[in-house]
Amino acid sequence: MARADLDGRSIKPLTICMIGAGGFIGSHLCEKLMAETPHKVLALDVYSDKIRHLLEPESLAWAGRIQFHRINIKHDSRLEGLIKMADLTINLAAICTPADYNTRPLDTIYSNFIDALPVVKYCSENNKRLIHFSTCEVYGKTIGSFLPKDSPLRQDPAYYVLKEDASPCIFGPIEKQRWSYACAKQLIERLIYAEGAENGLEFTIVRPFNWIGPRMDFIPGIDGPSEGVPRVLACFSNALLRREQLKLVDGGQSQRTFIYIKDAIEAVLLMIENPERANGHIFNVGNPNNEVTVRQLAEMMTQIYSKVSGEAALDVPTIDVSSKEFYGEGYDDSDKRIPDMTIINRQLGWDPKTSLWDLLEATLTYQHRTYAEAIKKAMSRPVASS
Ligand SMILES: NC(=O)c1ccc[n+]([C@@H]2O[C@H](COP(=O)([O-])OP(=O)(O)OC[C@H]3O[C@@H](n4cnc5c(N)ncnc54)[C@H](O)[C@@H]3O)[C@@H](O)[C@H]2O)c1
Ligand SMILES: O=C(O)[C@H]1O[C@H](OP(=O)(O)OP(=O)(O)OC[C@H]2O[C@@H](n3ccc(=O)[nH]c3=O)[C@H](O)[C@@H]2O)[C@H](O)[C@@H](O)[C@@H]1O
């Protein structure tokens, strides 16, 4: 049966240039596009491990519809040609782990702003549609966080719900280099918006709110550097797999809404296949029903991992650490992130489905199956003597 868009028109097969296709979100998007659509993907990245199962063997049902190009977009003259060959470019490439923002601020700013510039330019000059991945971090802190602790207004959604077309972007001072990422993302959003306004670029900007699931980041010492600090899902998974305490930064009081990657990818597919409804828009993509403090997240993950692995949890499963100890000088944090869903709901009729419990159970089952043996082996190896 021919695929139809939300307005009943049949969808023509597209060629998509996906930059950063080998990452967490890219791997899920490629999987969905191969399994459920006729679209072709030119997959650009410096790594391909997370999409290897889609590239080999050549007998796969979608062979010929996905092509990997090992390209660093910082310096590769093939970029423009690949964008020209495609109907649509999706840019996911970025440094996007908070441990880097204050320790490698230059790399962070270059990656999120400077390196994205040619992509925007080539799309604009060649009249190609662009879906660019920004972040919910562009909202920074909530207005409510500046009110007195006991102010009743803190409970009023007007002071914390984050709306694409109304909320301000509130970052800390320059010396808090945590905001280097958010600020670079904000500027590239403004540039894309301006290309749309002045030069007619067809664009959609996505602001993900803590998408999580299998293949997110890496487990230090197993499929990433031992000293590396991934995002919270992988940090907590790593501690659970090693039977270590989960570290709560500054007491784990910050709040987040987590969304299952598979729900979020449905929203991206709707954007891809409904350009008339998605062009010119900025979309929050999150799950406002899945809010927890980081401490609650740690408690839930501990309980679920115990169920999944059959191992009893530690007597004291968490430990408090200061942000300076954990991330170093210049760290700062978003206090609360509730996405307003009005625009995506109106334009694309999309809503998230999966509860936090269910998504953590699916994800931790994957983590256990994928890493438990490798961790056991690594931990039983004698430490090399100097
Ligand atoms: N996962 C989330 O919840 C989340 C939240 C907010 C924003 N985002 C944004 O979504 C995008 C994708 O995030 P992700 O979670 O998949 O991250 P990821 O780190 O898993 O994926 C990014 C990919 O981009 C590639 N890349 C980076 N620089 C490159 C370069 N110069 N040339 C070629 N490839 C390059 C990396 O190798 C990596 O595979 C990023 O822009 C990120 O800022 C993600
Ligand atoms: O995912 C998003 O929507 C955006 O937010 C993330 O930022 P953040 O949520 O702060 O990063 P996480 O590593 O997921 O941390 C969440 C919270 O857990 C805390 N944390 C993290 C790791 C840990 O071991 N312990 C711990 O308490 C952090 O301090 C933070 O308050 C990242 O910046 C991006 O991937 C993305 O743009």
Question: Which residues fall in each region the model found?
Answer:
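Amphipathic alpha-helical recognition patches that constitute DNA-binding helices
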Residues: 20, 24, 179, 207, ...
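C-terminal substrate-binding subdomain of Rossmann-fold SDR/epimerase-dehydratase oxidoreductases
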Residues: 71, 210, 240-386
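A short acidic, helix-capping loop that chelates divalent metal ions and anchors anionic groups
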Residues: 98-102, 214-222, 326-329
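Gly/Ser/Thr-rich beta-alpha loop segments that engage phosphate groups in nucleotides
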Residues: 22-25, 142, 215, 253-254, ...
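Short, solvent-exposed loop/helix junctions and linker helices
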Residues: 19, 110-113, 181-182, 226-230, ...
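NAD(P)-dependent short-chain dehydrogenase/reductase
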Residues: 144-161, 190-256, 261-272, 298-305
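Residues in well-ordered alpha-helical elements
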Residues: 22, 77-80, 99, 106, ...
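N-terminal Rossmann-like NAD(P)+-binding domain of SDR-like oxidoreductases, especially those catalyzing
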Residues: 1-211, 367, 386
